[in-house]
Every structure is written in structure tokens, then in C-alpha cells.
Amino acid sequence: MSTAANEPSRSRGKAPAGERVADWADGRLGIYSLAKANMRKIFPDHWSFMLGEVCLYSFIIIILTGVYLTLFFHPSMAEVEYHGSYVPLQGQMMSEAYASTLDISFDVRGGLLIRQIHHWAALIFLAGMFVHMMRVFFTGAFRKPREVNWLFGFLLLVLGMFTGFTGYSLPDDLLSGTGIRFMEGAILSVPIVGTYISFFLFGGEFPGHDFVSRFYSIHILLLPGIMLGLLVGHLILVFYHKHTQFAGPGKTNKNVVGMPLLPVYTAKAGGFFFLVFGVISVVSAIATINPIWAIGPYRPDQVSTGAQPDWYMGFSEGLIRVMPGWEINAWGHTLVLGVFVPLLIFPLVLAAIAVYPFIESWVTGDKREHHILDRPRNAPTRTAFGVAWLTVYFVLLIGGGNDLWATHFHLSINAITWFVRIAFFVGPVVAFIATKRICLGLQRRDKDKVLHGRESGIIKRLPHGEFIEVHEPLSQEQLHTLTAHEQYQPAEIGPTVDENGVERKVSGTQKLRAKLSESYYGEESQIPKPTVEEYKEITSGHGHH
Ligand code: HEM
Ligand code: HEM
């Protein structure tokens, strides 16, 4: 609200310049009320809440460096003869895109560093999103009311992957061209429409003369534009929902305990931005990434050895590499299952992320809002699902780099391929079972700690000769944190025969839901929390050390 016009301070002379600018802006944008409502917004403190910030800052760094690259990059596949300062490629024929990337690397001031920062920031951005997503998943921060924000995040992840892929393809070097060839193969395996899509995308026969300029618009405009919109929406929703917090004394589902946005959080966040920028710059200055001059220009009849996509695309590469080369030939057509099946599984691996919050809320039937985070051990089935998914992902990542594993560790490539084929099915099951057991073990340990205190490491000898370890009682805060979680009862189908003896039909989905609910909250899936009576009984000193 602007009150400058009728303020008595006028009589004391002109207000300071800053205040006048603020008044001017307030009259047009209403910033006072906006700031009043949001400046004291509270953010809880936990190291894992910095992961979203890492994504944000690396995205900003990508945009800043990307703009610089656009000043010198020529998105054209026209053939030129190279006459830049990199001697080994002098006189070679190559696309303008490749030649301009060489120029960025050798002839543009600061060009190589900016290219390196752009590429490293992209890798860290995707890694940041991946780990941030894991933080959100394992703590249950995707539950109501944050499911939509989870979907926004999911879209950011998928779009980030494709933005990275299109960027990787721009320099038109032998490695990026091989990646595009891989994509063309996958598109061609789609029955009926595959050839049409490929011709449409490449403007004719692969590789054609168009894909760099097309990918360029997609890379610098379309995808980052959509991502920017989603990102703003994502952050507005984080603001609107307020941040979740871990259980602790004084923290409830209705409050947020932490630091105010201004000045504390803003100062911390500003500092953290420079830290992220600094680390990415140092890494980029030390570790070469994508030395396109050593890889050479793209020629469709050549493939470089050890060809690898960037890490976030590795799992899709793994799917293709380990799939048996099955084919069906019928009516003069070939269905290449060896490529088409991986192409179908690829979106399924990703879709599992998108749908999980909705599946969990359906199974648990929980319609309440959740602002207090779970400790992963207290949600064993969810944690086990997460680890099973990660297992599939990392097993496929091994498959994607099977040649590198083979050469670096002197292993047989066939043995690795078979390992991945078997582990793709067995790995997640073993991971699920093991994770659940570990979670339950940790729950038991928590219970033990609450009832008997912390093992102090001090061994005492009693007068009659027995050795015991002295247990120290936990503080009230620790007790609160270890016992704050809710424990649900599994949803039951209820009696199938009513009081009049009429049988009720139970549908398959109801049965499935009850079974899954049992897996989430049944006796096998949670260790009952210690009750107040149990605690009192034990701590009152009857029969315990
Ligand atoms: C461009 C990428 C992304 C950026 C810049 C970003 C940024 C952020 C920031 C700054 C926060 C608050 C701090 C924190 O909890 O870390 C946050 C929270 C959140 N993010 Fe992201 N995020 C991104 C991607 C994702 C992805 C991939 C997912 C999941 C699939 C996701 C889901 C969420 C959810 C559900 C919250 C609310 C968490 C809570 O209140 O505890 N985000 N995000
Ligand atoms: C999430 C967003 C983005 C990701 C993940 C990403 C990733 C990449 C990657 C991995 C490369 C290959 C770099 C190399 O040569 O080794 C690249 C190239 C490039 N990117 Fe991006 N980028 C993103 C956004 C942008 C934006 C917003 C712009 C421009 C405003 C941009 C402009 C460029 C240009 C001009 C190139 C080609 C030059 C070169 O390869 O050095 N990028 N990008």
C-alpha cells in the first residue's frame, strides 16, 4: 500500500532515493503488500532441501552459458572446409555446426570454458534433479497437496533429458551423430509410422541437412521455454504449499519452523548460488568434457569406439544393448523387437515415477494433507519400491556402458550383457525384499532406543560379576523424533456377507487394494511403536538396567 502522498514525512523534506523508487514501484506493481505477505515466509532447514536449489542454480548457469554459445554457434549442416586454429583438422570437410563448435573451443575468447561449463552444468542439473526427486520420494513429500508439483517436477526431469540430448547432438561430431543414428534406429522400429516420422524429423533420408537447425530451435527455445514456465510454476507451488519439514519438537502438520525468506534464507541462497557456480566452473576448468576435436566430424558410415550417451540417457542405451536381437518377419514386413521392445519399456520406466503418488494414495486411501516428512525407514514398502526402481535404473546404466565395463575391468562383454539381462528381473525383487528388511530392522532399533536408551559404549561390571553395557536415556527431543510418525492400519475389505446373510460382491480391484494395503501397513511391514505404558514400565526401573 502506498501512502507516500499524504505522509507527514513529506514536510521533513524529500524521502531517501531508495524509498522513492520503492514508492514509485509500489504505486504500479503493489510490491509492498506482496513483500509484506512473503518476505517473512519461513523455510525449514535441512541439508537435503538444498538439492532443489542445486537444480535451480545449475539451470540458471545453463541458460547464461547457453546464451553466450548462441552468439558463436552456427546451426547449419552446410559443408565447409575447416581453416581454424586446430591444426590436425585443417582442410577437412565438415558441417558448419561442427566447425563453429571448433571455433568456440579454440578461437572464441573464453569459448571453451563456457562450452565446458554448459555441458558440466547440464550433467549436474540432471543429477541434481535425480537426487532431489529421490529426496522428495523417500520422504513422502509428494503426498497431498504436492502431487501436482511432483508432476511438474517429473516433466522437468523428462524435458531436461531431452534438452540435454538435443544439445549433445548440436555440435555434429562423430559421437553426437552416433546418438542421433541411435534415435533414428529406434524411430524406424515403430511399426507403420516409423519411416514417416523419421523422414519428417530429418527432412528426408537420414541424416539429411535439417536436423541440426531443427534441434537448435528445439534446444534453445522450445524445450527451455516450456521448462522455464514449469519451473516458475514449480516454485510458486513450493511457496504456496509451504515447505515440508521433518518431525521434531514444536513442528506440526500446521506450522513451519525455520528461517525467514528475508534476510536469512535469501542470503544463504545467494551464497549457495555462487558456490554452485564456482564448483561447476572449477570442474569445467579441470576436467575436459566432450572434446569434439578429438572425436572428429560426423559421417554416417563411421562410429567411434566407446560411444556413450550422457549419463542420464544411459539407461535407454542399456535397454537396447541387452535386448536380444529378436525380429518377426511377416507379410513382407519386419518388426524389429530387439529395438521396439526397449522403445516401449523406456517410457514405462519413466512413467513409474509420474504415477507413483497416485498409486500410493489409492492404496492407502489417505486423503489428508501431509506436511511432515516421513523417515524412509518408517515407510518400508515405499522405500523398498524406490530402491527397486533405482536398481532397475542402475542395472540398465551398467548395460548402457557394457563396453566400458568390459574394457576397464577385463570382463567378457557377453557376461556383462547376461548379468544385466538377469539382474533386470531379479535385481529389483531382491532389492525390494532386502530394503524392507533393513527398514524394519531400523524400526526395531528405534524402538529399542526409545525403550532402553542409547548404547553408551561403557561396560560396567556388576557386583556379582555380570558385565552390562550402560544405556543412556534419550532426550525428550530425540524421543519425540523417533515416535512422531503415524502408523496406519491396513485397509480391509470388510465382511463379505451382510447381517441378512446376503453375500456382497468384492471386485478384483478391491482385493488388489486390500492386498497392497496389507503390504504397506500389515504386521509384516511395520514394527509397532512403543506405547507410553511400555515406556513408563521400562523406565520406571522395574527389572532393567
Ligand atoms: C528444474 C528442476 C527443478 C528445480 C529447479 C526444483 C526446485 C525445487 C526447490 C527449490 C524446491 C524447494 C527446496 C527443496 O525441497 O529442495 C523444490 C521442492 C519440490 N520439488 Fe523440485 N525442482 C526441480 C525438479 C523436481 C523434480 C524432478 C521433482 C520430482 C519428480 C520435484 C518435486 C518437488 C516437490 C514435490 C517439492 C516440494 C517438496 C517439499 O515441500 O518438501 N522437483 N523443488
Ligand atoms: C536444460 C537446459 C539445457 C541443457 C540440459 C543443455 C545441454 C547442452 C549440452 C549437453 C550441449 C552440448 C555441449 C557440448 O558441445 O559439449 C549443449 C549445446 C548447446 N546449447 Fe544447451 N542446454 C540447455 C539449454 C540451453 C539454452 C537455454 C541455450 C541457449 C539459450 C543453449 C544453447 C546451446 C548451444 C548454442 C549449444 C551448441 C554449442 C556447443 O555444443 O558448444 N542450451 N547444450
Swiss-Prot record:
Transmembrane segments: 54-74, 122-142, 150-170, 182-202, 220-240, 269-289, 335-355, 385-405, 413-433
One Pfam family of this chain: Cytochrom_B_N_2
Reactions that this protein is recorded to catalyse: a quinol + 2 Fe(III)-[cytochrome c](out) = a quinone + 2 Fe(II)-[cytochrome c](out) + 2 H(+)(out)
The protein's required cofactors: heme
Keywords, in A-Z order: Cell membrane, Electron transport, Heme, Iron, Membrane, Metal-binding, Respiratory chain, Translocase, Transmembrane, Transmembrane helix, Transport
Chain sites annotated for binding heme 1: 118, 219
GO cellular component, one term: plasma membrane
Protein species of origin: Streptomyces coelicolor (strain ATCC BAA-471 / A3(2) / M145)
Residues bound to heme 2: 132, 234
Complexes and interactors: The cytochrome bc1 complex is composed of a cytochrome b (QcrB), the Rieske iron-sulfur protein (QcrA) and a diheme cytochrome c (QcrC) subunit.
Domain of life: Bacteria
Cofactor notes: Binds 2 heme groups non-covalently per subunit.
Protein name: Cytochrome bc1 complex cytochrome b subunit
EC code(s) of this entry: 7.1.1.8
Task performed by this protein: Cytochrome b subunit of the cytochrome bc1 complex, an essential component of the respiratory electron transport chain required for ATP synthesis. The bc1 complex catalyzes the oxidation of ubiquinol and the reduction of cytochrome c in the respiratory chain. The bc1 complex operates through a Q-cycle mechanism that couples electron transfer to generation of the proton gradient that drives ATP synthesis. The cytochrome b subunit contains two ubiquinol reactive sites: the oxidation (QP) site and the reduction (QN) site.
GO biological process: respiratory electron transport chain
Family matches, as InterPro entries: Cyt_b/b6_N, Cytb/b6-like_sf, Di-haem_cyt_TM
Family: Belongs to the cytochrome b family.
Cellular compartments annotated: Cell membrane
GO molecular function annotations of the record: metal ion binding; ubiquinol-cytochrome-c reductase activity
Membrane topology, as annotated: Multi-pass membrane protein
